[in-house]
């Protein structure tokens, strides 16, 4: 099958690799190179780099909502468009431009966690089950019919990297299965029950509320690493917690209290044991290294 691929981050790479092996990728659309590092050098997206290595034509328009881009896509000889974490809204004219429309890989149990941050919200909300869906896109926000779906049982303390990697590779496999059988698949409409929205994360959401349970805070730490990071302030400095573990111990402390010299912190329920931190503008450190340079005293109440 002849495919136009639209995607940007590392999450989309396994699918493009599979498409290159099993199908004919006619063009790739990805976000424009962005300035990175101290030298602010322009860096191509992972998808741009992969397409370049395979000599696939790459386009990086600033929008899909203009006649020039729409006409370009219509002229490309392709049967289908595959969209994964591209970063732009796809207008109706493009959704309907090819014989089989546009397919999307969405890493959640739709209609739960529709929107921009399904992986993060899955972890933050402590979900123990998820899914990867192959969806035929329509004009709504992740409201299209499901062509193929596979459920996942999640480890209790799965990290964002682990979940992303698992969903990326499963999604690639499911997409290839979908394309192989696309003429015979009966699309299934999404349920009108259980709809939730995985809104894009904000920096303010990263601030830790110590009155929440230790488990909820641990979920936030895992779901918000690397960005925006779950953080607290100490001596007017922002400190991100990159890794921790929780214990469902009963205690009598005010939430936010440092209960010993190992940086174990009382929460609304349970105790959080911090394992790795990063103070703003400094490198990440394990707890032993951190405490050698920053002395957070027992009985301190963190904000």
From Swiss-Prot:
The keyword Transferase applies. Belongs to the Fmt family. GO terms for molecular function: methionyl-tRNA formyltransferase activity. HAMAP family: Formyl_trans. CDD domains: FMT_core_Met-tRNA-FMT_N, Met_tRNA_FMT_C. InterPro entries: Fmt, Formyl_trans_C, Formyl_transf_N, Formyl_transf_N_sf, Formyl_transferase-like_C_sf, Met-tRNA-FMT_C, Met-tRNA-FMT_N. Keywords: Protein biosynthesis, Transferase. It is an enzyme of class 2 (transferase). The gene is fmt. This is Methionyl-tRNA formyltransferase. Its EC number is 2.1.2.9. Attaches a formyl group to the free amino group of methionyl-tRNA(fMet). The formyl group appears to play a dual role in the initiator identity of N-formylmethionyl-tRNA by promoting its recognition by IF2 and preventing the misappropriation of this tRNA by the elongation apparatus. It catalyses: L-methionyl-tRNA(fMet) + (6R)-10-formyltetrahydrofolate = N-formyl-L-methionyl-tRNA(fMet) + (6S)-5,6,7,8-tetrahydrofolate + H(+). (6S)-5,6,7,8-tetrahydrofolate binds at residues 108-111. GO terms for cellular component: cytosol. The keyword Cell cycle does not apply.
